Amino acid sequence: MTYQAKPARFDAMPYRFCGKSGLKLPAISLGLWHNFGDATPLASQRQMLRTAFDAGITHFDLANNYGPPYGSAEINFGEHLRRDFRPYRDQLVISSKAGWDMWPGPYGTGGGSRKHVLASLDQSLQRMGLDYVDIFYSHRFDPDTPLEETMGALASAVQQGKALYVGISSYSASKTREAAALLKSMGVRPLIHQPSYSLLNRWIEDDLLDALDDTGMGCIAFSALAQGLLTDKYLNGTPRDARINRPGGGSFKPDFLSEANLKHVRALNDLAQARGQSLAQMAIAWVLRDARVTSALIGASSAAQITELAGALSQLSFSAGELQAIDQHAVEGGINLWHKPSTDQRP
């Protein structure tokens, strides 16, 4: 049956300007990092994408190496785009990234060289069946490549018509400022930064948000649910179907489930219940409490999860007392897998 998007899909979704640009992003965006590779049935993926778009989620975020295996998320998304979303292309913001390991040999092992970045973009466009992406990111800072070379590659992507906007991900505040200045000198304004940010990973509050404000860049926070830790999944032990028990679940480390972390998670869950929200809904609302955060990037393994998370939008405000109580448990949890590139180090 031909997909027909819901006519009222935009009504309940807040759309925020991305930094000082004219582009608006939905308050909640859908990331395809997990659950859109070949291990997930296409029918399940299709249901998730339809549910998201019908809820007003107009931004789908990918990267060249999303899967598993690498590249499969983009291939599968291209199929869904062809079958369901081609008539809605101009209502979508589609992004991809390059910078992590992708293909064999010295030019595919990641980084920020012009060779790797632009070859990756061409491959991504081919996999998705697109002429351009709306946003193209440098996926990580590369200390082995001059920043001017990496930003030059991003500028070329815009100048060649292969990307409308460019951004960076997991860059430190100082490198963000440098990157923004370089791009502006090349006639391309940096649009957005994509850092990890959650109740248990607050590093961007130190100086990155200020850097984004100063440079006019938006912020889309990924891993806002700490890869599922900030949901009800682990409140009473580890379920059998948890990512930590699945092939390809290596990004979720056993250390994340420390007793200290679980103690804070349970306390945060109690605070969420008092607000009439699930823990996941409160975690999303909390990330969005700062106006400098344009969008919260969610992952999901089912359409029902997307519907639940979209429910966070019904209560985005917090009282001063709630924020004070949350701060007692919104502490560093040792879950930032992207700490090294975010501090200018080699991964």
Question: What would you call each of these model-derived segments?
Answer:
Residues 1-92:
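N-terminal binding-site loop/beta-alpha segment at the start of enzyme catalytic domains
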Residues 3-12, 141, 145-328, 333, ...:
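Beta/alpha (TIM)-barrel catalytic core signal, keyed to glycine-rich beta->alpha loops juxtaposed to Asp/Glu
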Residues 39-52, 112-128, 176-180:
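Short, acidic/polar
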Residues 125-145:
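Active-site groove signature of glycoside hydrolases
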Residues 23-28, 56-58, 86-92, 130-134, ...:
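Short, well-ordered coil/turn segments that N-cap beta-strands
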Residues 40-44, 72, 76, 108-116, ...:
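Alpha-helix N-cap and loop-to-helix initiation/capping positions
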Residues 59-63, 94-96, 132-137, 167-168, ...:
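Short beta-strand segments at enzyme active-site cores
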Residues 19-37, 95-109, 132, 137:
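N-terminal small/glycine-rich loop or linker at the start of catalytic domains
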